[in-house]
Amino acid sequence: MAQARQVVKYTFLRVEAPVLIWPAEEREAAVREFTELLEAGPTGETLLAYSTVGLRGDCDVLIWQAADTVDAIQRAESQWRATRLGPYLRVAHSFLAMMKPSPYLGRHRHPDQEGRRTRLKPAGGRYLFVYPMVKKRIWYRLPYDRHKAMMVEHFAIGHRYPQVKINTAYSFGLDDQEFVVAFECDEPAAFLDLVMELRESQASRYTERETPIFTCVLMPPADALQLALGLSAPEAVGADGLQRQVSLISGG
């Protein structure tokens, strides 16, 4: 029996300025409460935290979720709002999507292939690059064979950057965008080079929009919140620590 498609949610939060003048002990208590709530989520659901402090001017934290139902996403956000910190967290950006196998893969296969999955499986890369995407309407009027030929070129470019893992989710009818694309890697330069090369592909001419784009750093939730609340900056987490974090909080 095929696995049910997971619902995927990207919630970018901005900490409102009044929080930053709370006494340090109050901010630390707020971080503990919020972190305990995040880490107590249902088994098997994915929830990862990323910092965007200093990398975007309009948000501080990304919470990346995957759950089996839309209701679960709603329940989680309602619980966040009930915390001490909740009233001071503004949703700066929100993208809702769903996992779905790609229609362009055909017999093209390789281990743990991203485009065939109906459930999110984060790799645990230190950096996550996220953006919503909308195609031009003319793209959907092209014959399937032309679509496929352009996507084969697209996949071939991606294969030249094996250190970058792509996670594609579909938003048709669920949110304003058509796709939400998230790339995981340990070196931003690799992603930059990949994007520059993809701009030269045939499929690129049919892109209507792929902004805003977010550069995010994977951290334990407590560290991401501490950074956002102006508390002591966390020590850099090594690759092994990041993998443990992904395994513990994503049901992996």
Predicted regions and their residues:
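Short helix C-cap/helix-to-loop transition motifs enriched in small/turn-promoting residues
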Residues: A72, L85-Y88
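Short amphipathic alpha-helices in soluble, non-transmembrane regions
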Residues: R75-T83, D193-R199
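Short S/T/G/P-rich N-terminal loop/turn motif that feeds into the first structured element of a domain
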Residues: M1-P42, D68-I73, S94-R160, F172, ...
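Short gly/ser-rich anion-binding loops that grip negatively charged ligand groups
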Residues: V53, A66-A67
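Short, glycine- and small/hydrophobic-rich beta-strand elements in well-ordered beta-sheets
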Residues: L38-C59, P87-P101, F155-V180, L194, ...
